[in-house]
Regions:
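N-terminal glycine-rich FAD/FM-binding segment characteristic of electron-transfer flavoproteins
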Residues: 1-233
């Protein structure tokens, strides 16, 4: 375990826009990295990634490790898991954090399998054990009736996905800067088992429920759709 060092945050982005949960993870990652006296790195995967690193530095990253490749233009489990696993095997981070998003839940378990380590999903709390230095990963269990704290005692890296709006980002500081490490990976495209067809973004004027600060809902007592007007009022 002594050869593993540093904390990584997978910097999920789509079309150059970083997911809000990444800023939250960088805030928690900054706190943990300061406790462990280690570097906090953000890992970027995709294509045409220019300008994204500056955003990650502003929210606490010391360095950004990225693979900018046409093969990563569209998200696909096998390519993203191969790329992140390759980087982790090379740099050997002690901790890898990712958002418990559709993307994170889809490919991060593959990375854990590739690296022969454990993964705690949907965490709501992350702390460092002051005696062992292990990452204590807390998540709801048994239908949310209890909170379980899990450690990956014998394997590295320690991996966790974290729910949106659980951690707090640090205050953005555009004067912060860091190092960008440009990496490459030779994708065996002919071995792909899936094909990208298209991505159609839903057009709506409604607020994304995951970004809402307050959610008001109605049950069967409403009886008729028109009665939702009372809730809207």
């Amino acid at each position: 375990k002594s050869q593993y060092n540093g904390i990584w945050v997978y910097a999920e982005q789509r079309d150059g826009v970083v997911a809000q949960v990444v800023h939250e993870l960088l805030g928690k990652g900054r706190e943990l990295a300061d406790q462990l006296s280690c570097e906090l790195s953000a890992v970027l995967l995709g294509y045409n990634l220019n300008g994204i690193a500056e955003d990650l530095f502003a929210y606490g990253a010391d360095q950004v490790i990225q693979i900018d490749d046409p093969a990563l233009k569209h998200f696909r489990d096998e390519r993203y898991s191969e790329a992140l696993s390759h980087l982790a095997e090379k740099y050997k981070p002690a901790i890898i954090l990712a958002g418990a998003t559709v993307m994170g839940r889809s490919f991060i378990p593959r990375v854990a399998i590739d690296l022969h380590t454990g993964l705690t999903a949907d965490c709501t709390g992350l702390e460092i054990d002051s005696e062992t230095g292990n990452l204590m990963q807390t998540r709801p269990a048994f239908g949310g009736n209890i909170m379980a704290t899990i450690i990956t005692a014998n394997h590295r890296p320690q991996m966790a996905t974290v729910r949106h709006k659980v951690m707090n980002p640090i205050v953005r500081d555009d004067t912060r800067n860091g190092i960008v490490l440009h990496e490459e990976y030779n994708f065996e495209l002919e071995e792909d088992v899936t094909s990208f067809i298209s991505f159609d973004k839903e057009k709506t004027n409604l607020v994304n429920i995951t970004d809402a600060n307050v959610i008001v809902s109605g049950g069967r007592g409403i009886k008729d759709a028109k009665n939702f007007a009372m809730i809207e009022e």
